[in-house]
Design a protein with these regions (language model features):
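Short, well-ordered coil/turn segments that N-cap beta-strands
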Residues: 10-12, 76-80, 145-149
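Aromatic- and acidic-residue-enriched carbohydrate-binding clefts of CAZyme catalytic domains
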Residues: 22-77, 92-131, 159-180, 184
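Generic structural signal for well-ordered alpha-helices
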Residues: 3, 68-72, 86, 133-141, ...
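Hydrophobic faces of well-ordered beta-strands that scaffold small-molecule active sites
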Residues: 14-16, 82-86, 149-151
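Conserved, mostly hydrophobic/aromatic
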Residues: 6, 82, 133, 151-152, ...
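A conserved hydrophobic secondary-structure block that centers on an alpha-helix together
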Residues: 1-21
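Short, internal active-site loops enriched in acidic
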Residues: 88-90, 154-159
Length: 195
């Protein structure tokens, strides 16, 4: 229905936010735990920001590769380009819950149940994170014909990096003075993976 309404109003770009702390919503064949673990949370906050109320039922779900292809085709028939978003280096609790080795903290987060930014941040000094991103991008590029991909980049908690000796070593090796520079270097590296 949303795509039909967009077409009615001649809107031709749909930015699809597919990942966040609260859930990973797209099937990636190389990383099945993203949807086995990362797509579900054991409860969810209700009643708005900072509400103490929770629905204690399991929440979640994800789009299969077939679902994605069908939606991309449906949008294209309406002259709508879908721009996928895969959040990084923050807003990655769902991915890290599924693959803890990607995270910056010693204790990996769970899939977030509340709607504020969490401490789930990629360990950007670890080459496994870059390989993970490349692998995910390879599958995203196969599914989406868009010339664009959105990589998020907001609300990264530097505290997640402060406690990580890999990040300290990385900063020294790269002659970086602060965490903004760490994020900038990471973002530039990720941008170079987009082909």
């Amino acid at each position: 229905e949303l795509l039909d309404v967009m077409a009615l109003y001649k809107m031709n770009k749909f930015h699809w936010h597919l990942t966040d702390d609260q859930g990973w919503r797209i099937e990636i064949e190389k990383y099945p735990r993203l949807t086995q673990i990362g797509a579900y949370r054991d409860s969810t906050q209700i009643g708005g920001w900072n509400s103490p109320l929770y629905d204690v039922n399991i929440h979640g779900g994800y789009y299969t590769r077939e679902d994605i292809r069908e939606i991309v085709d449906f949008a294209a028939e309406r002259h709508i380009e879908i721009v996928p978003e895969i959040e990084m280096p923050g807003h990655t609790s769902a991915a890290i819950a599924a693959y803890p080795e990607l995270g910056s903290l010693k204790t990996p987060p769970t899939v977030a149940t509340y709607f504020n930014p969490t401490w789930g941040v990629f360990n950007v000094a670890d080459e496994r994170v870059i390989q993970f991103i490349q692998d995910v991008f390879d599958e995203i590029f196969d599914l989406f014909p868009s010339r664009y991909i959105h990589i998020g980049g907001d609300e990264v908690h530097p505290e997640s990096w402060e406690a990580n000796s890999d990040i300290s070593r990385f900063m020294k090796e790269k002659n970086l003075d602060n965490y903004s520079e760490v994020q900038m270097l990471f973002t530039n590296r990720v941008a170079s993976l987009i082909h």
